Amino acid sequence: MARTTAHITLLSDLTPPSQERTWLTAPHPTLPIVATCSSDKTVRVYSLSNFRLLSTITGGHKRSVRTCAWKPHVQGESVLATGSFDATVGIWRRWDSYGLLSSDHTTAAAASEDADSDSDEWRFAVLLDGHDSEVKSVSWSASGMLLATCARDKSIWIWEDLDDGDNNFETVAVMQEHEGDVKCVAWHPAEECLASGSYDDTIRLWREDLDDWGQVACLKGHGGTVWFVDWEGVENVPAGLQGEEGKWKESRALSGPRLASCSDDRTVRIWRRVPKEQLQQQQAGTPFGGTGIPSIIRPTGTDETWEEEAVLPKMHELPVYAVAWSKRTGLLASVGADGRLVLYEERFVDGSAQAMDTDGPASAPLSTEWVAVGVVEGAHGIYEINHVAWAKRADRGREEGKDEEVLITTADDGSVKVWTVR
């Protein structure tokens, strides 16, 4: 059932905060901990059980740590990739209770409590050197075998973790099609498909074809730098729903997870891949298969067609720096230079779900719209907010038996705040 408004309430700050700008906070994929990147050249690891600092990772980078990402599917240890303005990428490892992969949230929370002050146990395993200037974003693939990095040098690098016990990584691709600073990279939640956003105002999608990585789509629509992209969760489109809404969602699922983006143009947009089946239907019976050009010069079979599905309500007065798509509820959050935290919900347009004629197809096709359901003004006072992320709630205030989420915002004042959404 659609909500009319959402109540976004401050739960806690993560303490102690950094005394310098913080860029991004990455929730661990399985444990109630997060890693926060700071301009003071460190990464701080906090507990989401008691909101206290567990470790400070130092000594690996010579300039600001701009980005970090936890490697998924690791047993017995935690592995963190960091990207810095010193143009390098670091891989850090820690053999301890951080690495307990437990479905029992209580056990995981206790594990995070045990890992208190031994920051020296973080091992700087390897330095990945290749970029010519500031690294802006790092992202692990869903399998955990590939690491994507991007930088101000306009390039995207893909590294393979050889997982040979010697911390060896191999460069498998360097893509340089972007015409400006590459601000972000994000892997598809289930496939080896990479999305990137850039100062050139475009979003590009990349896949491997015959051992060669290349661009399969270039999404144009933003009128400014694309600061951040985030994928929809695979489970956001549930199967087995009844009625016309169920049919509509199953049809949309053919496109796979959608992509959200935000920009200097103050907008948040949603992009959808057009399924090949739909393209074939559109092209049937038209010259040259609907492309208007002979097949000999048509794009290759690996190319994909993406379309802008929605522009969300304009809620920001300044550039939007980050978006976060809840993999559990489908809610979308955005933050930016105006200090606002905004929450959006996708709904069926009034009446469209009841527009079915009993004897035939819908008189008005089902459609959805995005509605802003919550806003926090000045979430970090006068400071710009650089990042937002969803995480599983882990503190003692959560409702027993409920799988709650929290929002985590990271800002220029060095603070990281945790919010509940009801």
From Swiss-Prot:
Keywords: Repeat, WD repeat. PROSITE patterns: WD_REPEATS_2, WD_REPEATS_REGION. SMART domains: WD40 (SM00320). GO terms for biological process: iron-sulfur cluster assembly. It comes from the Eukaryota. The keyword Lipid biosynthesis does not apply. InterPro entries: CIAO1/Cia1, G-protein_beta_WD-40_rep, WD40/YVTN_repeat-like_dom_sf, WD40_repeat_dom_sf, WD40_rpt. WD repeats lie at residues 13-56, 60-102, 130-169, 177-220, 236-281, 315-354, 379-420. SUPFAM superfamilies: WD40 repeat-like. One of its GO terms (cellular component) is cytosolic [4Fe-4S] assembly targeting complex. The keyword Repeat applies. Signal peptide: none annotated. Gene3D superfamilies: YVTN repeat-like/Quinoprotein amine dehydrogenase. Belongs to the WD repeat CIA1 family. HAMAP family: ciao1. Essential component of the cytosolic iron-sulfur (Fe/S) protein assembly machinery. Required for the maturation of extramitochondrial Fe/S proteins. This is Probable cytosolic iron-sulfur protein assembly protein 1.
